[in-house]
């Protein structure tokens, strides 16, 4: 008697048929796999504890509001026509008011800047003074003729066309627009110094007491976050304010860096939430590199980018606004950090580069193009970036 089997001949044939195509396909035929890797959702910066958000970004938002109020109410229009208006500007900067916090106490507060804070505060005081003098309020007197005159080499005044035009701006005797310098200086001395110098510091992620309090969890009184979480969140909040000033439609050299930075912040926060501190440290170092390159790229774009060079070729003074912005971003580079935590450029190195652009008649000088190129090459080398595409 034959042994019993549960596999009938037709079933065996069907099984072999199913296997055969994998072994006998036409030469050159492409076989598409039906396997698809699981989709990994993009990271989000949304974290909760017991149904309540554990992310508090209020302080960075207040700092940005104070800075923007100073710029829009006083600096952009440079309409400081009397002592009352001048005192109002200085008081708002130093003490706050009108529902705005003071900006001055936030400037260069990290331990890395303690040596230079006095000099940096002096730079900001000079910018405010330059704004009033550029618009005709010199000494204790305001002169309408100074406010309404066109700027020229060695003479303050406006560049642009009619009064009230958005493109009209005021410059000092060397052609620099202090209002545009101010925005880049704030980017560095407040947003970058807070994010990179104060809060994104290895000492927080390696501190045993902070780790233990975080894992307990021991929450900050009155809030739903731990001290370690809030430290990272504050860095993220100041980055968001910096990112607004770094955005540019014409900046193509670092496409994707904004997404990489956001992902690094979000994944770093997630790593902290899950006690993966070494991974958080890795994201911290990536953020330092990416953010430094973003600031340097924006500086290069404003100093020697297409818009700047096109204006230099046609009507040079129209480029002064772009160059002034670029010098502001150049100033901010002293607050960037290498992956190791060391600065890319020192305070002295940055001031030296800026001084080279102010030599002679400043932006009015016939040698400006060559000096811009020299500064650009230096930044390109330091930050491993390509120079902007020329016309």
Give short role names for the model-derived ranges.
Residues 2-11:
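Bacterial N-terminal signal peptides that target proteins for export
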Residues 28-391:
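Mature extracytoplasmic or organellar-lumen-exposed domains after removal of signal/transit peptides
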Residues 19-22:
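C-terminal motif of bacterial Sec signal peptides marking the signal peptidase cleavage site
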